[in-house]
Amino acid sequence: ERRWDAVQVSVPNPHAVVFVESLDADVETLAQAPVVTPAAAFPDGVNVEFAERVAPGHVRMRVHERGVGETRSCGTGACAVAWVEAGDQTGSFQVDVPGGTVWVDIEPDGPLVLRGPAELVARGTVQWPRGV
C-alpha cells in the first residue's frame, strides 16, 4: 500500500494534487484508482492528479476522475496541477497528459486560462425513451 500527501484544490470541482518523483516508476500502482482518506474531506468524491516535475514550468500528469477512473486528460486537473506547481509565480505552464499537451496561463489576480488542442475521440448515438 502506498500513501501520498495531496494538496486540495477547487477549480471549482474538487481535486487532490499529488506530486511524485516519477510517473514511470510505479506505473501499476498509479493505474489503480486511489482511495482518498479521510473520505469526509471529499464527500462527493474527488479527481486525483499524479504529477511529476519535468522542469520549471513543465509537469507531466495522470488523472483519476471521480466516478470514471483514469482518463487521458482533464482540463480542470491540468489547471489544478499548474496552480500548485506555480506557487506564487505567474506565466505559462506546460502540462503533458497521456492525451497530449496543454498549457495553463496564470496571471496575478486573474483567472487560469487553459490552452490546447481539442480532438474528437469518439462518436456515438444516444436513444432517449419516449415520454421522458
Give each language-model segment a name.
Residues C79:
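Catalytic, metal-anchored helix/loop core of enzyme active sites in primary metabolism
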